[in-house]
């Protein structure tokens, strides 16, 4: 069954599910059934370094939202 995720981040980045490139940030992506390890590859300028998700009951207009934020600069 199709499932959908949207990885939210402040800039355009590649999105990886279980190490395989799926698409780009800030777009609705057809992920299929999970569970998945979601990350944005290197450089690791974001946090957390990954998220574990298991999309269920999603649609293209109501994807599972997965949020990442930019790492704070070291003082």
What are these regions (language model features)?
Residues 1-75:
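Short loop/turn and low-complexity linker motifs enriched in small/turn-promoting residues
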């Amino acid at each position: 069954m199709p499932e959908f995720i949207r990885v939210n981040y402040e800039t355009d980045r590649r999105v990886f599910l279980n190490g395989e490139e799926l698409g780009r940030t800030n777009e609705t992506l057809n992920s299929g059934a999970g569970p998945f390890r979601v990350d944005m590859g290197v450089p690791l300028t974001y946090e957390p370094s990954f998220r574990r998700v298991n999309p269920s009951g999603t649609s293209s207009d109501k994807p599972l939202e997965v949020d990442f934020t930019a790492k704070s600069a070291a003082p």
